[in-house]
Amino acid sequence: MWFFIYSAVLFVIVWLGTGIAVSFKTNQFQLTGFKFSRKLYYLFLSIFLVAALLEAISFYDVNAFLDFIIFMFAGILGETVFSFWWRTFFAKPIWSYKADTFGGEISSMLNFIPWGVSGKFAVMIWSTYRQFTGSGVDLSIFLLLWLLFIVFFLVQLVLELVMKLFSKKTLASSTHRELSIYIYFTLPITVALILLTFALGLNFFFLTVAFGVVYFVSEFLFGYFIFLLSGKKLWQYNFMPVNGGLSSIYAIIPFCFAGFYFTTIWLIVNSF
């Protein structure tokens, strides 16, 4: 929680400071409409690195900063793997990045710090969930979720290979309906989450929804702020876009799973 408090305070300071600095050049105070540059982008994003460092210093806990660094790289890795998985079912990527891209616009070098923040969001949501529900959900449950996901993913993969071997088609390519393919694509995630919801109850369902909603909203707010600040969109969703292409309905289920992805990493790292 302190990470986000520090981030909010630093954000206000940097935003106002930028407006004042620009006013000396333009003789006009402004908080939006700046020209996009990597210096401006990293100026604002650096507040999260500083916030993570302040959190580590405040609680004499170096892991608070190391966790952030791990989340940065884990986020890029997860985003890249997910994008390749998506492309096995769809002709176009689910999103296209517009600056400092790699891998055919499936990710961006500008994404490291935002993914670090995403990891912090996941830990905050999970900690709040544990505090208010007293739930016994721990690392073993998260590992069980991953086991279920891997099993159903492998089943899906085998079905695809069998279909392609005998008919030169796959289950995904046998229909041209985008929504049908999407439902089939997300089955390993949704089935694993549904099974654990039946086993653990509604509280687990609420945790899942919280991950999806918080990530969906925060992604839009971040993208919209950058657009408001500089007039530049850093990404565009290609499927079921909403909010001017900064969000997608199709991203909600992957976002739900992303919360468990980051929390699992955090639990493993902090178990040593």
Please give the residue ranges for each predicted region.
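Aromatic-rich, lipid-facing transmembrane alpha helices and their immediate juxtamembrane interface loops
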Residues: M1-F272
